[in-house]
């Protein structure tokens, strides 16, 4: 809760996130800590924060209909109240190795 920016770096494994990241998500999603239930449904408590999701994949294109990892992480962060999310995708590296340089460039821009 003290962080201003949450950075998640993950591969896309079989269209989704690795088990270790899912375990972290299960530890972070805590009622009355990171979200709360209301009469109108759950409300995220982590407002005014930013997130960066850095994903890497061999064949899955980030943001495509078969990329459940990025969609899931954006939904999870939104559930917590974090809606300012930037995605850095080093995707389809087995298809186009040049995409790695593009992802590094974007990460460097964000770090500046």
Predicted features and spans:
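Helix-loop-strand module that forms the ligand-binding subsite of alpha/beta enzymes
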Residues: 1-71
């Amino acid at each position: 809760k003290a962080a201003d920016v949450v950075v998640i770096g993950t591969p896309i494994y079989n269209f989704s996130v690795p088990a270790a990241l899912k375990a972290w998500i299960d530890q972070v999603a805590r009622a009355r800590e990171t979200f709360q239930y209301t009469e109108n449904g759950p409300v995220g408590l982590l407002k005014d924060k930013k997130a960066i999701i850095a994903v890497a994949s061999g064949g899955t294109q980030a943001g495509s209909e078969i990329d459940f990892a990025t969609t899931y992480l954006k939904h999870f962060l939104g559930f917590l109240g974090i809606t300012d999310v930037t995605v850095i995708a080093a995707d389809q590296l087995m298809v186009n190795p040049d995409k790695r340089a593009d992802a590094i460039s974007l990460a460097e821009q964000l770090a500046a």
